[in-house]
C-alpha cells in the first residue's frame, strides 16, 4: 500500500497512514514505528529548551502523548502480524520517559511541561490526601480526550472485541456451572447505546465549562 507524500522544506517525507490496521507488512510497520520514535525523540529534546514559551510547551507535550499512543498502535500491529513484541520490551528508548500525575489516566508530562503553572504543584502534592471533588476539578483543567474515558481508536477495537468475547464465553460457562444457584429472575445487562465521539466531546466541553464556572464563582 503506497502512502501519500508531503514536503517539509525541500525534503520529501513519507506520511504515515492513519489506518494502522490496514498495513499487513511487518517491515512497513517497523519503518513507520521507527519514524514515530524519531519524531518523539526530536520533540522530547525540544521540550527541554529553556526558551520555549508556555503555549509551545503545552502543544509539544500534547503532541508527544499523541505520538506515544501512535507508537503503541504500531507495536500492537507488529505483534499481531507475528513480528517483534515490543509491548514486553522495557528498554529505555528516550532520554525522558515522562511522568504521570496519578494513576487516573496515562497522560504524561515531559521536560519543562512538569514546570507549567498548576502542573508543578500537582506533582509536589500528595494526591491521595486531596478531597475527591477537588481532585476531579484539578483533572478537569487538563485537556482530556476520549482516551481518558476509555474510548479506544478504531484500529484497536478488534482487539477489545476479541477480549470481550473471550470473557463473555467464560462468564456463560461459569453461570452454566452454577446451575440452580442462579436466580430465576436474573437478566443480562443490555447496553442499548454506546456514546459516539461527538457525545464524548460534548461531555468534555460541558465539564470544562463547569470547571471554569466553579473557578470563577
From Swiss-Prot:
Q: Which domain of life is it from?
A: Eukaryota
Q: Name one GO biological process term.
A: generation of catalytic spliceosome for second transesterification step
Residue intervals passing through the bilayer: none
Q: Sorted alphabetically, which keywords does the UniProt record give?
A: Cytoplasm, mRNA processing, mRNA splicing, Nucleus, Spliceosome
Record carries keyword Thylakoid: no
Question: What compartments host this protein?
Answer: Cytoplasm; Nucleus
- A Pfam family the protein falls into: Isy1
Indicate whether Nucleus appears among the record's keywords.
yes
- Kindly state one GO CC term assigned in the UniProt record: spliceosomal complex
The entry assigns this protein to a family as follows:
Belongs to the ISY1 family.
Function, please? Involved in pre-mRNA splicing and cell cycle control.
Q: How does it assemble?
A: Belongs to the 40S cdc5-associated complex (or cwf complex), a spliceosome sub-complex reminiscent of a late-stage spliceosome composed of the U2, U5 and U6 snRNAs and at least brr2, cdc5, cwf2/prp3, cwf3/syf1, cwf4/syf3, cwf5/ecm2, spp42/cwf6, cwf7/spf27, cwf8, cwf9, cwf10, cwf11, cwf12, prp45/cwf13, cwf14, cwf15, cwf16, cwf17, cwf18, cwf19, cwf20, cwf21, cwf22, cwf23, cwf24, cwf25, cwf26, cyp7/cwf27, cwf28, cwf29/ist3, lea1, msl1, prp5/cwf1, prp10, prp12/sap130, prp17, prp22, sap61, sap62, sap114, sap145, slu7, smb1, smd1, smd3, smf1, smg1 and syf2. Interacts with sde2.
Q: What is this protein called?
A: Pre-mRNA-splicing factor cwf12
Amino acid at each position: 500500500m503506497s502512502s501519500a507524500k508531503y514536503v517539509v522544506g525541500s525534503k520529501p517525507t513519507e506520511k504515515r497512514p492513519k489506518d494502522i490496521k490496514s498495513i499487513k507488512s511487518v517491515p512497513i510497520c517497523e519503518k513507520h514505528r521507527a519514524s514515530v520514535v524519531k519524531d518523539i525523540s526530536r520533540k522530547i529534546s525540544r521540550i527541554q529548551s529553556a526558551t520555549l514559551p508556555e503555549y509551545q510547551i503545552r502543544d509539544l507535550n500534547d503532541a508527544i502523548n499523541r505520538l506515544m499512543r501512535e507508537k503503541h498502535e504500531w507495536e500492537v500491529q507488529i505483534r499481531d502480524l507475528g513480528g517483534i513484541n515490543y509491548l514486553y520490551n522495557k528498554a529505555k528508548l528516550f532520554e525522558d520517559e515522562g511522568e504521570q500525575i496519578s494513576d487516573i489516566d496515562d497522560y504524561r508530562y515531559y521536560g519543562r511541561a512538569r514546570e507549567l503553572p498548576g502542573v508543578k504543584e500537582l506533582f509536589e502534592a500528595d494526591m491521595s490526601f486531596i478531597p475527591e471533588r477537588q481532585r476531579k476539578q484539578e483533572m478537569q483543567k487538563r485537556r482530556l480526550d476520549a482516551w481518558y474515558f476509555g474510548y479506544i481508536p478504531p484500529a484497536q477495537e478488534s482487539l477489545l472485541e476479541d477480549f470481550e468475547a473471550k470473557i463473555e464465553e467464560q462468564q456463560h460457562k461459569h453461570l452454566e456451572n452454577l446451575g440452580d444457584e442462579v436466580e430465576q429472575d436474573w437478566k443480562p445487562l443490555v447496553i442499548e447505546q454506546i456514546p459516539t465521539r461527538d457525545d464524548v466531546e460534548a461531555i468534555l466541553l460541558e465539564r470544562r465549562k463547569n470547571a471554569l464556572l466553579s473557578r470563577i464563582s
